[in-house]
Regions:
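Conserved NTP-donor binding/palm subdomain of two-metal-ion nucleotidyltransferases/polymerases, i.e.
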Residues: 1-138, 144-375
Length: 375
């Protein structure tokens, strides 16, 4: 008899949880594109046995062999020796939402299958590290190298996520690419940098990766930043400008409180990733005895357009930061976006060619009017 193994892109033991009280024993993400499978009764028992390496006990159990065949069809059991998605054990959920926890594991497996280095930032890990009181996040934030965001976004299509591309995608202007949740109900933000960190994206990723540690999500080992580095990320999130508005007193106090909780090591790390312009005041408040002056610090490249309230002016300022060779394509997409870009912006371009063209013409006319009004 071939040796059976439990395979999965994420799995949780639900016994003792609210879902367990409803009769579900396990939830397992198949090792191929599909929705999570909820197991109970004999199916859960057999799957757990092969996950524990006890498949040999089932060799003469005809009922168990039929169950194994069904599990194989579901994509959660395999007779392939050394399967890349073989699971050795199953953990219980520690996130408020088990489905969100499965998304972390799924992303880690999909990224590994495409040779993409991936880190997970913000979210429940901040709560676990004592850096925020809120436990749950509505989406999952991950961080990859520039260019890998597009590869990961396309790889996640088959799992039900849709990338929301913008005219600035791939130019370095946008710091993340959002993947629409679909049936999973959990959006994903794929970061290639973080606002306020002004070191080159590849270099900052390397620093964050070096300052990360393993954390298990849905039976899968993932990487999240250590406390000090994660404190910098959380503080930057608090103080970044939003639609023309700079950080106010509440945001500055929130950032300083996070940095204080993360420890004095954040000063050196902020200097290493070049986040001192954005964090100078919060760092001074958090650590007055160790306060340093950063008079030569320059605003991050995206701070200018983030502080611009007018959408046309914001687009123009952002356009100035785009490499020259990419500007024509960005201008074209700003004026004449793809249907997917219009839908991502919340517009309804219609289904007919005529309606789509009319919507685009209306956009061009509106853009011209706004530009003339700026004069």
């Amino acid at each position: 008899m071939p040796s059976w193994s439990a395979v999965s892109f994420g799995a949780l033991d639900l016994r003792g949880t609210e879902l367990g009280e409803q009769g579900f024993d396990l939830v397992v993400v198949p090792a191929r594109p599909a929705v999570p499978v909820f197991l109970m009764g004999r199916g859960a028992e057999v799957w757990l046995m092969i996950a524990q390496g006890r498949g040999g006990e089932l060799e003469t159990d005809e009922e168990a062999l039929e169950v194994l065949s069904s599990l194989e069809e579901m994509g959660i059991a395999s007779r392939e020796p050394g399967h890349s998605a073989q699971l050795q054990g199953v953990t219980q959920p520690w996130l408020v939402s088990p489905i969100h926890e499965l998304v972390y594991a799924l992303l880690a497996h999909v990224a590994a299958a495409h040779d993409i280095e991936i880190l997970f930032i913000k979210g429940p890990a901040l709560h676990a590290q004592g850096l925020r009181s809120r436990q749950h996040s509505g989406d999952v934030d991950c961080w990859v190298q520039p260019g890998d965001d597009l590869r990961l976004a396309e790889a996640m299509r088959s799992w039900g996520w849709k990338p929301l591309y913008s005219p600035f995608t791939g130019t370095g202007v946008t710091h993340s690419l959002t993947l629409d949740a679909g049936d999973w109900g959990c959006a994903i933000d794929v970061h290639t940098r973080f606002p306020g960190i002004d070191s080159p994206p590849h270099a900052s990723f390397d620093i964050v990766r070096a300052e990360s540690e393993p954390r298990v999500f849905a039976s899968t080992s993932c990487l999240t930043p250590r406390v000090a580095l994660h404190g910098i990320v959380a503080a930057l999130h608090a103080v970044r400008p939003f639609v023309g508005s700079p950080a106010g007193a509440a945001e500055l106090e929130e950032a300083s409180a996070v940095l204080r909780a993360a420890g004095v090591e954040t000063i050196e790390l902020a200097e290493r990733v070049n986040a001192v312009y954005a964090l100078e005041e919060p760092l001074r408040r958090a650590f007055p005895a160790e306060a340093r002056s950063y008079e030569s610090a320059r605003p991050p490249a995206d701070w200018g357009w983030r502080l611009t309230a007018s959408a046309p002016r914001r687009h123009l300022r952002a356009l100035r930061t785009v490499p020259l060779r990419k500007k024509p394509a960005v201008i074209l997409r700003l004026l004449w976006p793809t249907v997917a870009m219009m839908e991502a912006a919340g517009e309804a371009p219609g289904t007919s060619w005529r309606r789509k063209a009319a919507t685009r013409v209306q956009r061009v006319a509106a853009a011209v009017r706004r530009l003339l009004a700026m004069r």
